[in-house]
Swiss-Prot record:
CDD domains: RuBisCO_small. It comes from the Eukaryota. The lineage of its organism: Eukaryota, Rhodophyta, Bangiophyceae, Cyanidiales, Cyanidiaceae. PANTHER family: RIBULOSE BISPHOSPHATE CARBOXYLASE SMALL CHAIN 1, CHLOROPLASTIC, RIBULOSE BISPHOSPHATE CARBOXYLASE SMALL SUBUNIT. This is Ribulose bisphosphate carboxylase small subunit. GO terms for molecular function: ribulose-bisphosphate carboxylase activity. Disulfide bonds: none annotated. Pfam families: RuBisCO_small. InterPro entries: RuBisCO_ssu, RuBisCO_ssu_dom, RuBisCO_ssu_sf. In this alga, in contrast to plants, the small subunit is encoded in the chloroplast.
Length: 138
């Protein structure tokens, strides 16, 4: 099952040239770009590990692409995404986020039905990948 998080998630994986162009777009908007990674693909896991520091004031997409490549070398079987943060007063939020690396095998999720008080049915999703300990999921 393909994890669909962020912009372009329903499109085929971006090439390095397409990634570079998106990074250039973010730089042109004045956004700070960063790289993050995780081995926990749960949709509510919004706190991924940060690769280095956010790349504030970087004007060359090659610098950020270098960081993406280094992160891919270190974590070839993790999800890696590029984030662009808009620090404009009143916005101060992620403006662009897309996955640039994913594991070769994405095991998917199981949907569990849980009966709660007064026979209320609740649903929970659980990633098959998280059944293994952190660092050995893929």
């Amino acid at each position: 099952m393909r994890v669909t998080q962020g912009t372009f998630c329903y499109l085929p994986d971006l090439t390095d040239e397409q990634i570079r162009k998106q990074i250039q777009y973010a730089i042109n908007q004045g956004w700070a770009v960063s790289v993050e990674y995780t081995d926990d693909p749960h949709p509510r896991n919004s706190y991924w590990e940060m690769w280095g520091l956010p790349l504030f004031d970087v004007k060359d997409p090659a610098t950020i692409m270098f960081e993406v490549q280094e992160c891919r070398k270190q974590f070839p079987n993790h999800y890696i995404k590029v984030l662009a943060f808009n620090s404009t007063k009143g916005i101060e939020s992620t403006a662009l986020s897309f996955i640039v690396n994913r594991p070769a095998n994405e095991p998917g999720f199981v949907l569990r039905r849980i009966e709660s008080n007064d026979r209320v049915q609740r649903y929970q999703i659980h990633s098959y990948a998280t059944e293994k300990p952190e660092g050995s999921r893929y």
